[in-house]
Amino acid sequence: MALLAAGALAGCAATGKAPGAGPTTSVAPRATKSARPAAAAIPKPTPTPTLKPAPPPRPAALLVAPPSAAALPQTPTLPNTTDTAFKNLIHDFWLAVTTGNPDYAKPAFFPEKAYQQVKAISDPAYDWQTRLWDEFALDVKAVRPLVGRDARLLKVVVPGQYAIWVPPGACYNKIGYWHVPGARVVYERGGVTRSFGITSLISWRGDWYLVHLGAYSRNAPVGIVDDPQPGPGVPGPPGGC
């Protein structure tokens, strides 16, 4: 009996639940959802910049001679009207009158340092700045309404037969130079040919320079146009210095 009880107890121990243990529940593991791969970032297209049209190049004056030439001694060489120096003078002058900006003509205007060598007066630098250049600038602005911006230059007629050598002692000068009066600037505007004069060109070291455009002298600080005419006009007259 003792053995059977022991066996029975052993059987109960083998198959029975531990005292105090609650009912067991079998839970099947849940299937986990696999994470979706992150969508690849699509780069935004870079906007194409709007290209603005480049501004037209600004016009530029051209040199008649190196600036250093103004401080060198005068020469007796008679200038011509077919070389690059004269073509640059005309380029600068026409640019000045069609824009109304006299500064474009400064490389083509008789240099201040050369003027100081030429004139036998007390203060040639002051005279150049306050009379010679200022009057030329006024004359350029007076010509501007006649030609406008759209006029087309046809030719510049320089009466070489009137060119003279102005000797030292004449016209308050201490050294000489070549002078030619009454060149004609012939242009076309609106299909009509017109012209005006350049009162005086003078030389420095074999090149022509502008010096008086509208008049040699005036009674008031106003711009003057020299002999504006329909058609090509007539060069000259001779004289002056």
Q: What name fits each language-model region?
A:
Residues 123-194, 241:
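Surface-exposed, charged secondary-structure patches
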Residues 19-25, 169-241:
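Low-complexity, intrinsically disordered terminal/linker segments enriched in charged
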Residues 23-55:
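Extracellular mucin-like PTS domains
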Residues 107-127:
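Short, solvent-exposed secondary-structure junction/capping segments
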Residues 1-3:
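N-terminal export and membrane-targeting signals
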Residues 47-95, 99, 107, 117:
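Short, low-complexity N-terminal intrinsically disordered segments enriched in polar/charged residues
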Residues 8-11:
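C-terminal motif of bacterial Sec signal peptides marking the signal peptidase cleavage site
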Residues 13-16:
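Bacterial signal peptide processing site
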